[in-house]
Amino acid sequence: MTLQIGVIGCGAIGQDHIRRLTRTLSGARVVAVNDIDPQQARDAVTKYGLDAEIYADGHEVVAAAEVQAVLVTSWGPTHEAFVLDAIAHGKPVFCEKPLAVTADGCMRIVEAEVAHGKRLVQVGFMRPYDEGYRALKRVIDSGQIGAPLMLHCAHRNQSVGERYTTDMAITDTLIHELDVLRWLLGEDYASAQVVYPKKTHHASAHLADPQIVLLETASGVRIDVEIFVNCQYGYDIQCEVVGEQGIAKLPDPPAVGLKHAARQSVEIMTDWKERFIASYDVELQAFIDGVRQGALTGPSAWDGYAAAVAADACVRAQKSGAVEAIAMAERPAFYRG
């Protein structure tokens, strides 16, 4: 069975997913598209040679008889309504982050999915599909380094645009760490604090950069995450886990080691899409396979809610300078196991 997918949102990430659905992945095809800009939808159909209906409204895509699953890559504030509509129609939905722009919105999706009685939602957190993170989790889960005590992490971008704001360091950047570190450790966060080092002169006047986020988990693991979005030298993701008996470190992407002109060097990536391109392929293939097999296994609506609650606390901590509690609702039995 070839899964027939409707895509809502034909911007950069939407077209990137259309490309991989059309040219890279197996078991699915795009049969319907929508974008707030009709020309973008038409351009996507032409560019990728789609045999797809263009709909004027995203909710029409959800309701379309030919659509068996939905891909939501539209503007963030629209995600909640489209995901809820997909659940109401009983259709599996892959939603790019954010699942909703508030934790309350994520909880409404959780409640709707629980009421439906079957997992239909996968959230577009791709790092758990990165082979480096998977290898790191295997080491942690094996017990080889003992119980994790501390994590030292960094999320560095070469530069960001003028529209990037201080809170986006949490909602657009740290959000990936909030998801993947919770997945690595298998436990929720208890508190968050944000501190500000000396500001780089490469940052816009309105932007606090860098920032250091200090997290504590329910069991007491301490995590520090450096967010530095104007580091200049490249795109660099680091994660070191300090355990009771050893240390495990996220591997850097493979690169040719060069010795030349009395120097030794390794190239550093500058594009975040290049760094995680394989992960995007694997996560969407996992969604396709999960739908076809009748069991989704990727990041769930509950994971989207957990990330949103933690992000809200981090934004509060940015403003207060205090240690902010991260208080989540009780996890429904539906999402356990």
Swiss-Prot record:
* Gene3D superfamilies in UniProt: Dihydrodipicolinate Reductase, domain 2, NAD(P)-binding Rossmann-like Domain
Kindly state which keywords UniProt assigns to this record, in alphabetical order. NAD, Oxidoreductase
Q: What is this protein called?
A: Inositol 2-dehydrogenase
As recorded in UniProt, its EC number(s) are 1.1.1.18
A single GO BP: inositol catabolic process
Organism of origin is: Burkholderia orbicola (strain MC0-3)
Q: Which GO terms describe its molecular function?
A: inositol 2-dehydrogenase (NAD+) activity; nucleotide binding
Subunit info here reads: Homotetramer.
Family affiliation: Belongs to the Gfo/Idh/MocA family.
The job of this chain, per UniProt, is described as: Involved in the oxidation of myo-inositol (MI) to 2-keto-myo-inositol (2KMI or 2-inosose).
